[in-house]
Amino acid sequence: MKLPCTIRSITSSHFRNSFRNVSSVIDSAQEECRIAEDKQFVDAVKRIVRGKRSWEIALSSELVSRRLKTVHVEEILIGTIDDPKLGLRFFNFLGLHRGFDHSTASFCILIHALVKANLFWPASSLLQTLLLRALKPSDVFNVLFSCYEKCKLSSSSSFDLLIQHYVRSRRVLDGVLVFKMMITKVSLLPEVRTLSALLHGLVKFRHFGLAMELFNDMVSVGIRPDVYIYTGVIRSLCELKDLSRAKEMIAHMEATGCDVNIVPYNVLIDGLCKKQKVWEAVGIKKDLAGKDLKPDVVTYCTLVYGLCKVQEFEIGLEMMDEMLCLRFSPSEAAVSSLVEGLRKRGKIEEALNLVKRVVDFGVSPNLFVYNALIDSLCKGRKFHEAELLFDRMGKIGLRPNDVTYSILIDMFCRRGKLDTALSFLGEMVDTGLKLSVYPYNSLINGHCKFGDISAAEGFMAEMINKKLEPTVVTYTSLMGGYCSKGKINKALRLYHEMTGKGIAPSIYTFTTLLSGLFRAGLIRDAVKLFNEMAEWNVKPNRVTYNVMIEGYCEEGDMSKAFEFLKEMTEKGIVPDTYSYRPLIHGLCLTGQASEAKVFVDGLHKGNCELNEICYTGLLHGFCREGKLEEALSVCQEMVQRGVDLDLVCYGVLIDGSLKHKDRKLFFGLLKEMHDRGLKPDDVIYTSMIDAKSKTGDFKEAFGIWDLMINEGCVPNEVTYTAVINGLCKAGFVNEAEVLCSKMQPVSSVPNQVTYGCFLDILTKGEVDMQKAVELHNAILKGLLANTATYNMLIRGFCRQGRIEEASELITRMIGDGVSPDCITYTTMINELCRRNDVKKAIELWNSMTEKGIRPDRVAYNTLIHGCCVAGEMGKATELRNEMLRQGLIPNNKTSRTTTSNDTSSKS
């Protein structure tokens, strides 16, 4: 019989429930049995741990080793909470001998136990090992707190240790997270010292906003900050540029009765100095006495550095003096900034004195400051002091670098001590310093400046061999050397080589070449180069314009010179005395002294201050024109305008009075000089002797000579040459030779001008070419031959009609490195025209112009006259027109001849 479906269902359900109940009872019984067995197992292991049996044997049994789990170890460690050393031994034994993988909880239980027993070092080591597992800070905290509760602890020291470890491990943000979990989840508070370390860790990693947030959290849970925490907070506020709150924090710290020290005040002083509120910082330092605090070395150094930042170097020096009086040893940064500031202010002596004083404290400025100080001393021409400072560097153990040596090498080169400069270069190499282009540039410039171009070329070659690329400075220095020797073509070749390498010329390059081109008389090339500056985006400066002005003045083209003065001022470049001086001299040299006076007066009305050199040119102009009264009037105006007459001015006036035989003025000037306490120098005495020698008044000339010696002035080669020249021209050649022989014993060596006096006599009048050639050969041996001496010899050959020998002499002079000039060629052209050999004369003319030598007025007149005599009227007219285009005025003879030719052609 079948049961109804419902009954079957009820019966089935009842069976299942009954089964579940039975199963649950069985499971519960089994769990209780397992727990009991685990407890028995743990107790057994505890007995082993605390017993005297060998752990190696007891714990190696299969019964123990197979059953031992992490939960068992945790229970055993909790059981050793009062004997953490035993627990640590057990922990380490399992790890080292059984390779047991301990749980995080086991680590945390043992850390708690060790900290409780004040065993912080092993606790810290254990914590470090745990954190190597790359666990999340929250996971570590949760397990650590769970174990804290299981162990029924009351101290939060383990959590402090965790935060401190995160700070030491540069995981400051993880430390902050632990702190926040402590105060929000479990109401535990770290120690103040832990929070101080955490806050300073945030400051160290520039988490200033988080540092402030941490501080606020601390205060909100009732933690009372100490001075170290306040210091970190004040530093954070200063870094956040919130100086108002920083000052409020100082006040709050003082109000809470916190045991303060100087450190937070130093931090605030530093913050104020960085914001350039130095005087407020100085005020805080002054107020320290009222707080029973004394400024320390940090206070002073911070203030010195801050004062230097706002350019208050004098006050900074006073602060440094105060610090040194207290026997505080200043920092290198404070000393360096103050020394550098004083140096920039031009107070080199104060800077040097400070360096000497701080050496006693074992402090010295850094190498950069020493280099800058040595450089300033060199620029101030205090070379001895620069060398002493360099020596002092070695004594204090400060090793010079390549910059130091470069500065000193440059100094010695500028002074002409080229051998010393070379020895320093060798010292650089010996000390293993890397050579740069700078010392080579100095050596090249120095050797060019003192005339040794071949050595300069050698240094440039050495540079290139050392794979050092010449710079624009290198090229410009060598160009300047070539220009000074009259080798303008070499200078121009070097310029094209430089630009061909893609090195852009500087303003100094252009100015150097322009000066050289003007000296060589290559005006058109100078103008072309001046215009080329724009192509290189180089703007002319005052010096460039001064070169252009002076160049045109020396050529006598005053209108062009004034055009450049106008252009200069229109471009906003203010002229200086170097601009005006050549204009004044140029006007005077072209017979326009009165116009020069008008120009000078105009400058005075325009508040342009002229120096005595400018006025000397004007005095020279009036004296040259015989206008001595006007010259004396200028002297009065000079005094009224605050310009003192110097020896040069008096020399010009004395020379003028002698040339125009104004004895009254001459003696009046000597008396005036005496009344002013001025003694004639060798230049004035030589001028007086020269004037008397030229008039043949040798008795008076030698009388002045004796007076010169009695007054302590030694005659030089110019003085000797003046008398020798006068004697030669007066026909007293033997006496001149005797005087010349007396020069060397008194350290006056005859120069090319001296020998030129004899050469001039031998090649004029009764020409004695044999003696002239012998003398010139002697001049050549003494390396004294120049263009003038060659010209005299050429003139002598031409006068004797020995044109071939004269022509050979031109070839020889070029071979000797002496450049022919316009006079050289004009002398030859004149002789060729005299012989009616106009064809060769024109060929020589073309050769001259192709070499870049500009013909002068005499040259044009000579060749034009020769062409007219030879019937070459077309060429004569062509030359006259060219002459006029050059701004040169033909003489009367040339004008008459060519004008009559023009009239004949028209008719």
Swiss-Prot record:
Instruction: Provide the residue intervals of the PPR repeats.
Output: 103-137, 155-185, 191-225, 226-260, 261-295, 296-330, 331-365, 366-400, 401-435, 436-470, 471-505, 506-540, 541-575, 576-610, 611-645, 646-680, 681-715, 716-750, 751-782, 786-820, 821-855, 856-890
Name the SUPFAM superfamilies for this protein.
Answer: HCP-like
Annotated stretches, region: Disordered: 887-907
**PANTHER family recorded:** ATPASE EXPRESSION PROTEIN 3 (PTHR47932), PENTACOTRIPEPTIDE-REPEAT REGION OF PRORP DOMAIN-CONTAINING PROTEIN (PTHR47932:SF26)
Among the Pfam families in the record, one is PPR_2
* Low complexity bias spans: 891-907
Report the SS bond pairs: none
Which family, according to the similarity comment? Answer: Belongs to the PPR family. P subfamily.
For whether the record's keyword set contains Repeat, the answer is yes
Q: What is this protein called?
A: Putative pentatricopeptide repeat-containing protein At5g59900
InterPro entries attached to this UniProt entry: Pentatricopeptide_rpt, TPR-like_helical_dom_sf
Supply the alphabetized keyword list: Repeat
